[in-house]
């Protein structure tokens, strides 16, 4: 097909192994609906890490995450929350809400990670898991197999003089969605921050550090509230 959308596809099997002696042809045809995505659609996977400056095991966890992500062929968006361990100079007010995704929000740990905020029951009952090479690869692979239900086009313009950020969002649904039950948020992250880190020295480079949300809250705003 040369167009996108949900279409009915019919498949017919005949001339199996070069033969034409199928007596019963009543079961040779199958039809069903298949959704065809745009040719230029790019899938992004959200990988959120949990870390802390006082966490001595976190530099090793960062290395494991970096290795898995660098060797992945997927388009990955990485965010590092300074939460799950003791709060530090990079912990933001929104970070505490994301402890909700731990197996036990009152007993958290770091280094930790979650992918697309979804749990894999074969690994853990909760989205957040301890960083492990094999499990992180599995979560990314399964996230890549999931069906995306919308395409997002984000256009940003930053005014250096006014220090103002303007954001234009276009949302194209690929299936029926309920606007009053879907939330939208924009994260601000900062790279290459030099600062102290337990087991990493006084000039450790912190990457993908979560610095807050444009919406001003942890969970975002309803699509119906966007103008």
Question: Residue locations for each model-derived region?
Answer:
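Intrinsically disordered, low-complexity Pro/Gly/Ser/Thr-rich segments with frequent PxxP/GP/PP motifs
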Residues: 1-4
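Enriched for extracellular/lumenal, surface-exposed ectodomains of secreted and cell-surface proteins
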Residues: 9-24
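Generic low-polarity alpha-helical segments
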Residues: 9-11, 34, 113, 120
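A short linear-motif detector with a strong N-terminal bias
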Residues: 11, 57-58, 162-167
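Short beta-strand elements
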Residues: 23-43
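Residues that flank catalytic or metal-binding motifs in active/ligand-binding sites
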Residues: 30, 43, 74, 109-111, ...
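Local sequence-structure signature of Cys/Sec-based thiol-disulfide redox active-site neighborhoods
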Residues: 37-82
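Short, conserved sequence motifs used for protein processing/export or organelle targeting and
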Residues: 80-227
């Amino acid at each position: 097909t040369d167009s996108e959308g949900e279409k009915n596809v019919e498949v017919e099997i005949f001339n199996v192994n070069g033969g034409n002696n199928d007596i019963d042809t009543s079961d040779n045809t199958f039809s069903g609906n298949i959704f065809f995505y745009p040719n230029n659609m790019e899938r992004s996977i959200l990988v959120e890490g949990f870390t802390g400056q006082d966490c001595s095991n976190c530099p090793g966890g960062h290395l494991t995450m970096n290795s898995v992500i660098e060797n992945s062929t997927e388009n990955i968006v990485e965010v590092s929350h300074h939460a799950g361990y003791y709060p530090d100079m990079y912990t933001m007010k929104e970070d505490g809400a994301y402890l909700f995704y731990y197996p036990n929000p009152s007993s958290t740990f770091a280094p930790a990670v979650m992918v697309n905020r979804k749990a894999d029951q074969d690994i853990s009952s909760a989205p957040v898991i301890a960083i492990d090479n094999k499990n992180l690869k599995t979560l990314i692979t399964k996230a890549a197999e999931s069906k995306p239900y919308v395409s997002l086009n984000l256009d940003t313009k930053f005014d250096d003089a006014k220090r103002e950020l303007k954001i234009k969002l276009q949302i194209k649904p690929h299936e029926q969605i309920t606007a009053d039950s879907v939330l939208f948020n924009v994260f601000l992250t900062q790279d290459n921050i030099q600062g102290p880190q337990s087991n990493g020295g006084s000039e450790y480079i912190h990457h993908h550090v979560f610095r807050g949300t444009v919406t001003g809250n942890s969970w975002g705003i309803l699509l119906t509230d966007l103008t």
